[in-house]
Amino acid sequence: MHPVLRLYEDVLSTAETVEFRLPPLPRFIFVVHGSAAIGGRVVKAGEAWQGEREVVVRPGPEGVACWRWELARGDAGSTVASAPGMITHEKLTAFL
């Protein structure tokens, strides 16, 4: 199976106590607006985080909008937010 590169836009608000748990995958998260605690590190607008382990994303006091790139097996499903106060849009899927 060919690998797939996916780009998501995640928006987490502060209206709810939310956290987004992501499974272990090679990924890169760029914070577009606001800030977030990603893997215990505060990442602000214009900054990025990268890693391959399981990670938790929590919005900062003003919420967060981020772009998330993930490299996965082609037969793996999408990793999307599914709780109040969170929304994910899959922007791009490219089979490599």
Name each model-derived stretch.
Residues 1-96:
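Jelly-roll (double-stranded beta-helix
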